[in-house]
Amino acid sequence: MPHSSDSSDSSFSRSPPPGKQDSSDDVRKVQRREKNRIAAQKSRQRQTQKADTLHLESEDLEKQNAALRKEIKQLTEEMKYFTSVLSSHEPLCSVLAPGAPSPPEVVYSTHAFHQPHVSSPRFQP
C-alpha cells in the first residue's frame, strides 16, 4: 500500500501550507471586495445620471405643458371673440336671412385675400 500513500503525499504537496492558504484567501477576498466596491460605485453613478436625466426631461415637459396651456387659453379667448363677432353678425347678415336672394358672384382681387374680413386689434394676422 505504499503506492496509495504516495498519492496522498502528492496531494499534500499541491496544496499550500495552511498559513499560506489563509493569506491567499485574504488576498482574493480583498480583491473581490475592491471589485465589488468599484462596481457598486459605478452603479450609483449610473443611477444618479439616470435620475438627473429624468429630472431634466421632467422640467422640459413641464415647460412644454405650460406653453401648451397658455396657447389653449389664448385660442379659447380668440374663439370666444370670434363667436361673439359671429353672433353679432348673424342677425344682420343678408346671406343668412330667410327668403334673401342668392348672393351675387363676387370677384376678388388677389389683394382682397390679404385683408381680414373682421378687423380685430387683438387678433391681427
Swiss-Prot record:
Residues 26-89 form the bZIP domain. Residues 1-58 are annotated as: Disordered. SUPFAM superfamilies: Leucine zipper domain. Keywords: Activator, Cytoplasm, Differentiation, DNA-binding, Nucleus, Phosphoprotein, Repressor, Transcription, Transcription regulation. Residues 1-14 have a biased composition (Low complexity). The modification Phosphoserine is found at S43. It is found in: Nucleus; Cytoplasm. The modification Phosphothreonine is found at T48. Signal peptide: none annotated. Phosphorylated on serine and threonine residues and at least one tyrosine residue. Phosphorylation at Ser-43 inhibit DNA binding activity and transforms it as a negative regulator of AP-1 mediated transcription. Residues 54-75 are annotated as: Leucine-zipper. One of its GO terms (biological process) is lymphoid progenitor cell differentiation. It comes from the Eukaryota. One of its GO terms (molecular function) is RNA polymerase II cis-regulatory region sequence-specific DNA binding. One of its GO terms (cellular component) is cytoplasm. Residues 28-50 are annotated as: Basic motif. CDD domains: bZIP_BATF. AP-1 family transcription factor that controls the differentiation of lineage-specific cells in the immune system: specifically mediates the differentiation of T-helper 17 cells (Th17), follicular T-helper cells (TfH), CD8(+) dendritic cells and class-switch recombination (CSR) in B-cells. Acts via the formation of a heterodimer with JUNB that recognizes and binds DNA sequence 5'-TGA[CG]TCA-3'. Belongs to the bZIP family. Heterodimer; mainly heterodimerizes with JUNB. The BATF-JUNB heterodimer interacts with IRF4 and IRF8. Interacts (via bZIP domain) with IRF4 and IRF8; the interaction is direct. Also forms heterodimers with JUN and JUND. Interacts with IFI35. This is Basic leucine zipper transcriptional factor ATF-like. It comes from Bos taurus (Bovine). The lineage of its organism: Eukaryota, Metazoa, Chordata, Craniata, Vertebrata.
